[in-house]
Amino acid sequence: TNIDTRAITHKLRDAGKPLKGSIVPVPDDHAFDQLHATVLTNQQVAQVSTPKPYPNPGVGMSVVVVDFGLKNGILRELSRRKCNVTVLPYNATADEILRLDPDGVVLSSGPGDPHYVKSAVLEMIRKVQEQVPLFGIGLGHELFALANGAQVIPLGVEHHGMNHPIKEIITDHIVYANQSEGYTVDWSTVDRSKL
């Protein structure tokens, strides 16, 4: 067909964050009208977070997981370590978290742009981190950085899918991970932050 797919790939990669879509045969314009009328929410975390707290009992350390779009793998790993887990909604307050007297707090992964998460979440992180160790995964990590004055920026090319190599610098060991991320902490702002 004489289409240079390598050149197309390079153009898409170099252009930054591309628009995504699929080309399919459509018998009429009604499908396009529906697409134009679709409004995507910026409040993705509110859509996927648990509406009510729930326990994931264990006999070990007490851990609160703040659900920004929690994946079962996180709970599974905490259970393997016998942690006594309480999962709270994304909009839990610092007082609600601290009242549980946790040994640690996990800020879970989740969807979307961290800048759209309500500022009350950043305030909760600031208050809780003064009294309890925090661990952020994905979106939780980005929110932790924002709460402490670092900047979070879009990746030039998002990372989605499996088999992304990650090199552990100290041991020179390479592991492969599934990734789904569109943002990263701007490391040039970390030195000026509270991190």
Regions picked out by a protein language model, each given a short descriptive name:
Residues 1-95, 99-100, 112:
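RNA-binding accessory domains that recognize and position tRNA/RNA substrates
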Residues 12, 148, 189:
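Short, flexible helix/strand-to-coil boundary loops that buttress conserved ligand/catalytic motifs
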Residues 72, 184-187:
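Active-site environment of divalent metal-dependent phosphoester hydrolases
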Residues 76, 177, 189:
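Short histidine-centered beta-strand/loop micro-motifs
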Residues 104-179, 184:
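Cysteine-nucleophile active-site neighborhood
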Residues 190-195:
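Short, intrinsically disordered, charge-balanced linker/junction segments flanking boundaries
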